[in-house]
Amino acid sequence: MRQPSDHRPDGRIDMANSKVKAVQQLPSERQRDPERTRAEILKVATAEFARVGYSGARVDNITALTRTTKRMIYYYFGGKEQLYVAVLEQAYGDIRAIEQELDLKHLSPVEAMRTLAELTFDYHDKHPEFIRLVADENVHNAEHVRDSEQLGGLNSPILGLIQNILNRGYRDGVFHRRVKAIEVHTLMSALCFYRVSNQATVKAIFGYDMSSPTTRRRQRLFIAEMIPSWLQDPHPGRATK
């Protein structure tokens, strides 16, 4: 008997029929554990998008690296672009969740800012795939980030966290440089991002290996001390209004 086609007369894919087939093709264990299936697809997709970028990634390659089918990727995510947005949302969500787990209230403003800088450094250092994803999304002018309904809400808490530390520092008289939370965040991120994103070129041009354990320890200390010292400067020049 001829099987019904997933394509409508107008040539478009019948997603309802396609989803039914996708579920039917899954092993029974995977039908019972959709969250694990989705998580596995996201894990493989993250590695693939980080490796070759959005333009270079192929759904067929992601399918081949998972124990699932191409139909299931479309079932869970809708398509390559939606899958990429989901990867970005998870990548940003992971670091934001770790930041929110920090208990900084019992620390002095200086120690709190130093601790946040150390965490930011460590996360970037341990997750080069995050660096590559963000760099590639900037190549695409953040078009996929703008398509996400979640990323704005996911990322706003870090500014509140930094602002709280700043407010305590100003109140206690230990921070003198008047800055915005977004300025601290972008400066801290830039210092941690560059040492991972530019390791290869810096080593090739200057012979300076930023990935060596010794250099890593030195740079972690520099960045963790630099941010609080910058805020503590008693002669900061013209303050930000």
PLM regions with names:
Residues 1-25, 119-122, 126, 156-172, ...:
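C-terminal peripheral helix-coil segments that are non-catalytic and often amphipathic
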Residues 37-45, 62, 87-91, 95, ...:
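Generic hydrophobic, amphipathic alpha-helix propensity
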Residues 40, 111, 115, 119, ...:
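Amphipathic alpha-helical interaction segments
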Residues 40, 48-82, 86-87:
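Helix-turn-helix
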Residues 87-116, 146-153:
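Amphipathic alpha-helical linker/stalk segments
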Residues 111, 147-154, 171-187, 240-241:
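All-alpha amphipathic helical-bundle segments outside canonical DNA-binding/catalytic cores
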Residues 112, 125-149, 199-206:
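Amphipathic alpha-helical segments used for helix-helix packing
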